[in-house]
Structures are given as structure tokens and as C-alpha cells.
Amino acid sequence: GCFTIKPVTVSFNPAPNVVVTNPPAVCSPATVSITSIGVTAGSDSGLTYTYFTNPGATTVLSNPSAIATSGTYYIKGTNTTTGCFVIKPVVVTINALPSVVITNPAAVCAPATIDLSVSSVTVSSSTGLTYTYWRDASATTSLSNYTAVSASGTYYIKGTNANGCSTIQPVSVTV
């Protein structure tokens, strides 16, 4: 039984530093990209990123640059030189639009006016909305006299929820 003892050098490659910042929330139907530079800013340079729907990184995310569903996804940062990788979660938030349902106010005879801010105009809408009143569907020209509208026409009511998402709907006024 002859034997020889030789020293063996074992080296460990460090895991890459992967920093993940959740992208800002958006309002539906907008999508979110987790491939943008800001999501992995602060990570080691030169990493290759792949995107998954599960923490074990076995189910590839089909379109990581246009995610349309809220949830937790996973980013795998790999150092292609060493083969070492780290998997980190990223949370995507896509907020729903509020429902704004308009009930046109009853016609009035001049000199009477119509108050668009009364609850009966928006009673069937989502709760907790903040309303603004507009002359146009693009919400560029505000309707300053929305509590005393004296001219017939189509105006617009925009409802915004606590997440900042909004929906705008027309309201018909007959004076």
C-alpha cells in the first residue's frame, strides 16, 4: 500500500451581487418591464439576467418587458464566467382602473343650473374616488363652474382612486 499525499487547492467563486428594486406601480392596461436598467441598478456589472415566474427559476417568464399581471416574479443574475447565480424576487403592481358610472342629471329650465358634483350623478361608481370636472375628454380644460352649469352640452367627469388611477366619462347636461 503506497500512497502519496498532495495538497489540493479549493477555491470558491463568490455569488454575484444582485440588487432588485421593484418597478413603480402602473394603472391597467399599462404593462411593466422588469428588464429595465433601474430594476437591477446597483448589481454587479456584466451579469446576464433571466426572468422566471417561480422562485426555483424553472418556469421562464414569457415576456418580462411587458408584464400585464400583478405578482411576484424572479430575476436570476448569472456571472457567466463563474456560472454562479443569485435569484431575487421582484414585485410588479398593476392597479385596476376605477369604475365611473354617470347618471345624467335631469334637464332644468334657465336660469336654473345643474350641479355635477351631487352624488346622484356618480352614485354607481367605485367608492372613494376623487372627482374632477372637464370640458373635454382629454381632461385638458377644466370646468370651473361644475357646481352651477348653465349651458347645455357634454362635459366630462374624471374619477381618480387612491392609487392614482383614473377613468373619465361624459355627462350630458340640458338647460
Regions found by a protein language model. Name each.
Residues A30-A41, A112-S124:
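A short beta-strand segment in extracellular, disulfide-stabilized domains
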Residues A41-P55, V123-R135:
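Solvent-exposed loop segments of extracellular immunoglobulin-like
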Residues A15-N22, L97-N104:
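Proline-enriched interdomain boundary motifs that mark the N-terminal boundary
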Residues P14, P55-A57, T81, A137-A139, ...:
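Solvent-exposed strand-loop boundary residues in beta-sheet-rich modules
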Residues V60-Y73, L143-Y155:
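Solvent-exposed segments in extracellular or luminal domains encompassing
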Residues I5-S11, V86-I94, T167-V175:
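C-terminal edge beta-strand
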Residues G1-I5, T81-I87, C109, A162-I168:
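Short, exposed coil/turn segments at beta-strand boundaries within extracellular/luminal domains
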